[in-house]
Amino acid sequence: MNKPSEVKPVALNVPDYVKHSGLIAWVERIAALTKPDRVVWCDGSQEEYDRLCEQMVQGGTMRRLNPAKRANSYLACSDPSDVARVEDRTFICSEREEDAGPTNNWAAPQAMRETLGGLFDGAMRGRTMYVVPFSMGPLGSPIAHIGVELSDSPYVVVNMRIMTRMGRKVFDVLGSDGAFVPCVHSVGMPLAEGQQDVAWPCNPTKYIVHYPETREIWSFGSGYGGNALLGKKCFALRIASTMGRDEGWLAEHMLILGVTSPKGRKYHVAAAFPSACGKTNFAMLIPPHGMDGWKVTTIGDDIAWIKPGPDGRLHAINPEAGYFGVAPGTSEKTNFNAMATLKANVIFTNVALTDDGDVWWEGMTDTPPAHLIDWQGQDWTPAIAAETGRKAAHPNARFTAPAAQCPSIDPEWENPKGVAIDAFIFGGRRSTTVPLVTEARNWVEGVYMAATMGSETTAAAAGQQGVVRRDPFAMLPFCGYNMSDYFDHWLKLGRRLEETGATLPRIYCVNWFRKGPDGKFVWPGFGENMRVLRWMLGRLDGQAGGVDQVFGISPAYGDIDWTGLEFSPDKFEQVISVDLPAWRAELALHDELFTQLAARLPEDLPLTRTAIERRMAA
C-alpha cells in the first residue's frame, strides 16, 4: 500500500469504554492513511443524531421537513451522478479469480490494494472521520455479527443509526478481542484549507471493494445508499454470504414474515424477489377482504441471515434495524403499512418537496401536486412533466425508516434466536411462462427453481417480450463468491439437515406478473397474494390439494380460497398454465446460465433439468 505522506498524526480521541486494541490500531492506521482533520467515535445517541442532522441542514445536504407533516424528518438530495448502486464498480477481490466466479467483477487483491492505497491517501483531508460501530442483528444474538465503518460522511452516520444497531452498546458486545468486519468509506473529496464544501460530496471515480478472505470492505467515491451504508448489501450479503459458506449458514436477499391463521397457528416464511418485484409490499401484506382472521407480521423486508438451530431447523433473523426502501410506487393503496411507517423520524433521499414542506413521489397519490421542487432542486409541475417527461422524484429515491415504527412489525422481530422458517418463496417478474405458484417436490428441485429464476429487465416494446435477466436466488449482484459454489452450498445444507432428520422448509416459486392478451396483469396482486400464501401453508399442513406439473406442483382452481374475490377459472388458467413450447425455450435459457457456470456447477442441477425435459416428453 502507498506510504502515507508525512503529516502530524490526528488525535484519535479514543473513548475510555473502547477496550479493543486491535480496533484502535486499525483506526489509527486508517487515520494515518486518510488524514482527516479529526476523529469522532459515534455513540448512537439521539443527541448525536440531531446534531449531525442539523450540521447537514446548515451545509445544504439536507432540509428539515415540516414537523407538522413529518416529525423529525429530513430530505436529502444527492448529486445527480450519485443515485444508485454501481454494479460495474463493485469488485470481489478473492485471492483466486475462480472463487469470485463468472458473475462477479474480480480484481487481483494486491493490485486493488495498491489502487485504493493511492485513492485513500489523504482522501479525508479537511473532513471528520466518524467511527461507526454497528451490529447486524440483535446485539448479542448467536446469529448476529459486528462491523465498524470508518466514514467521512455524516449522512452515512445518521442512516446507519436507523439501519443498524449502532453506537456505544456495540463495544460492550465486542469487548477487548471480539471479531468485527472492518469497513472503510470515503466520499473521495478532500478539502484544501479554506475550500468550501459542496452539499453532496462525491467523486466520479468509484470503487466498492470486498476482500472475502479478510472480511474487509473498502468503498470510495459514492455517498449513496448501498455504496456507502456498508452494513447493507456489502456486509449483510456479499461478505456475510462468504462467512456463511465457510461456517455453514446462509445470508440471503430475502424478506421474512410471520403468518398467523384464524386458529392461532403461526408460520414463518422467507421470500426472495429481485428489485421491483414487490418485496417490501409482500413483507407488509394486509390480508384482503374475505380472509378475515389471518394476520401477517413483518420481521424483515430485504435481508435474512439463516442458521441451523439446536433443534435442527433453519432459524432466521433480520440483520437490519430499518427499511431502506424505494419510494416511487409506494402509496396507501400499494403498501399501507410502509406509508404508516414513514410518518416520523425518516430520512428521505431524492424525493420531491411540496410547497408545504412535505414529500411527494410518483405513485404516492393519483393526482400530483400542482407545484413541487424536484429532486434536483428545480421547479416541477404536471405541465412540465407532460412536456419533458421529467420525474419529480428519482426512480431510485429512497426512505430510511426505523423498523420498530412499522404497524405490522412482528413481536419476534428482535428475538436473538431468530424464527424457525417453514417455507422459502422465490419469485421474479415474468409476463409469460412461469406459473402463479409452484411447489418444489423436494429440496433439489427447489434449489433448481431458485437457481434459474429470472426477471424481465425491459418493458415490452412494440409487442416484443422483455429481456429475461437470470437472477439466481435474487442474489446475482450480491453473492460474494462463485455462484456455482453458492448453489452447492444450498444443496449441501439441505443434505446435512436431512441427515439429522430435520424437517426442511418447503420451497415455492411464484410469479405475480403474468399478462393476458391485452398486455395487462391478470393476477390482482398486493393483498390478494395472501390467497397464494394460504395455499402454501395448507400444503405444509397436508390440508391443500395440488396438481403435478412438469415443474413442481401447482394448485387447481378449487384449491385456492376465493372468498371475497371475483376471479374466474379462465383467468386462473391464464396465470397457472404451463405452455410446453414456452418451457422448451425456457430450458434452453437455463442451459445458457449453466454453460456460463459450468466450471463448478453441481451435477444435481443438470440432472434436474433432464428430469423436467423427460416429464415434458412423456
Swiss-Prot record:
Annotated cofactor note: Binds 1 Mn(2+) ion per subunit.
List of catalytic residues: 277
Keywords from the named record: Cytoplasm, Decarboxylase, Gluconeogenesis, GTP-binding, Lyase, Manganese, Metal-binding, Nucleotide-binding
GO BP, one annotated term: oxaloacetate metabolic process
InterPro entries: PEP_carboxykin_GTP_CS, PEP_carboxykinase_C, PEP_carboxykinase_GTP, PEP_carboxykinase_GTP_C, PEP_carboxykinase_GTP_N, PEP_carboxykinase_N
Subcellular location: Cytoplasm
Keyword tRNA processing recorded: no
Cofactor(s) the record lists: Mn(2+)
Role description: Catalyzes the conversion of oxaloacetate (OAA) to phosphoenolpyruvate (PEP), the rate-limiting step in the metabolic pathway that produces glucose from lactate and other precursors derived from the citric acid cycle.
Protein name: Phosphoenolpyruvate carboxykinase [GTP]
Gene behind the chain: pckG
GO molecular function terms listed in the Swiss-Prot or TrEMBL record: GTP binding; manganese ion binding; phosphoenolpyruvate carboxykinase (GTP) activity
Pathway assigned in UniProt: Carbohydrate biosynthesis; gluconeogenesis
Catalysed reactions, as listed in the record: oxaloacetate + GTP = phosphoenolpyruvate + GDP + CO2
Organism domain of life: Bacteria
Matches recorded under Pfam families: PEPCK_GTP (PF00821), PEPCK_N (PF17297)
Keyword presence, Transmembrane: no
